[in-house]
Each structure stands twice: as structure tokens, then as C-alpha cells.
Amino acid sequence: HWQAGMLDILYSNEEIFVSYTEDIGNDKKWCKWFSSWCDSYTSTSIARGLIQDNELVSLNNIFQSQPPLVDKIHWGSRLMIKDDLLYASVGERAQGSVTQDPTNHIGKIIRINRDGSAPKDNPYSSEPNWLPEVFQVGLRNPQGMALNSNDSSIYITNHGPKGGDFFGEVVKGTNYGWMDVAWGGTDYDGSIIGDGSAWKEGLLKPIYRWIPSIAVSDMIFYKGNFFPELNDKVILTSLKAQRLISLDFNDGKASNETVLIEGMGRLRDVEQNDSGEIFVIIDDNNSGIWKLVKK
């Protein structure tokens, strides 16, 4: 399934949450007549598991994005817990403007309880045509998600098309605008998206953008003593540019982009441990988990 598979995993209070590609199946009776109908329909799904004595004793689905689709790209899907609520990003699966449609989960941030139910104070829970899990709309391919302990806010990274990657905040009931806007990017053939605007009044504006695209992926807000020079900086991975970069982030503004590592391969994931050590995952033929060391 191209970019599909296991998408993210999160441990919290003896539970794990896993986002992954769920195969919904197809209408096999039509396969011999229409080969395209043999493609499986898939959804971004989330399962919750219980850990006891370092063993997984249960694993059950708590969320399945709607509708299932056959497209095999732009899954996004990162997980974060804040105030005992689970936030998850759902990519737009190359469906474009459906991110503005309230009757689906495509291209959105969803917020659910740990059992998969929708919180009553979600922004659209009382709207008859909105799915109650929807928290934020208008995203393309949100690849990273992190909680900033300094301001208790959640932030994301998102892939633009040909340019327009961005770092921005998850804000209740807001709209990033895809694909009415492309955040400064264009389509892959160079044509404009929407009316060519990078941003419009009424939409949430990204905090920091990359033009051309670097395929920004995972992120953390670094807190630790192992690399004191990185404290309170945003650390981000890049697939296309194959870099680990840092941004200063103060008062809602990002600046001073600095390349920390370059040329190791497509950097997919970044994490830190309690000691402040930093680990990255390379999404390439030379895949593996690497630990950063001091010079």
C-alpha cells in the first residue's frame, strides 16, 4: 500500500495507541470485470492496547476514519495525548478539497477520548452534519505532532504540494485551508492551486513555511541536559532534504533555522529519552534507529 502500514505508536499510562492502515476489503465479485475495483479500501485506524508486566494483553480498534478510500498516499497520522484526550492527524489521501467537507475525517485533526468516543466539547459535536471527532480541518499530509510543555499547546508539521510545507499550531475549530490555499506552493506541474493565495482571511496561518518543500516530517520540543544548546528549540526531521533541523520558537514565532545533521538519508522520526538523548529513524534502504552523539 505504498506509504501505508503502521503509522505511529504512543505509550501512555500502561496503554499503547497505534495508528495504522486498516484494510477494509473490496467487492471481489466485480474484480474479473473491473480490475480497478479489486483495489482494497483502507482507512486510517487507531487501536488501543493494554500493557501488563511488559506484555500486550489486549488490542482493540477505537477509531476508523471515514470514508474508506483506495488511494495509497498522504496518510499523515501522528498521535498525541493532552489532558487525557487523544489527538490524531488524518491525511487527505490525495483527495484534495474534501478536507473542507464536514462529513468525513479526511485531512483533519481529530480528538477523541481514550475509548474512542468524541468529547462533548469538541467544536462541532453539536453540528448535525459534522462528524463529532473533528477538531481542526484543511490539512494535506500532517507528518509530525508534538506537545510544547512551555505553552501546553500541540503543534504539527504538514506537507504542502510543490512547496508550502509548514509548522503550525493545532487550534480548536480552525481551518488551514487546503486546497483553497497551498501555503505558497504549487501543484507538481507548476499550476496554481485555488487562486494561488498562500493564505486567506479567516484561515489559520502557519507559523513557519518551507518553499521549496523539504518534506518536513516528525518533530519534538527538546527539553534536556544532554544537548543544552538545543533546549526549548523545535527539532524537526526532513525526508526530501534529508536533514535534522532546529528552529528557535518564542512567543508563537519560529526563526533561526539551523541544520544539525545532513546527508544520512530520509529522516522520518525523532524522539528523545528522559536523559535528553536524541534518536532518529531513517526511512530508507539503510533504515534503522540512530542515536545522536556529541562531537
PLM feature spans:
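Short, catalytically relevant binding-site loops at active-site mouths
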Residues: 141, 161-163, 174-175, 183-187, ...
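Repeated scaffold domains used in trafficking and secretory/extracellular systems
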Residues: 267-269
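Mobile, glycine-enriched helix-loop/loop "lid" segments at the mouths of ligand-binding/catalytic clefts
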Residues: 110, 169-199
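Acidic, Gly/Ser/Thr-rich repeat motifs that build Ca2+-stabilized beta-propeller blades
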Residues: 1-96, 146-160, 212-250, 273-294
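Blade-edge beta-strand/turn elements of extracellular beta-propeller
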Residues: 1, 49-70, 105-144, 194-211, ...
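Repeat-solenoid scaffold signature
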Residues: 130-169
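Acidic/polar loop patches that form or flank catalytic/metal-binding clefts of enzymes
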Residues: 118-121, 154-157, 175-181
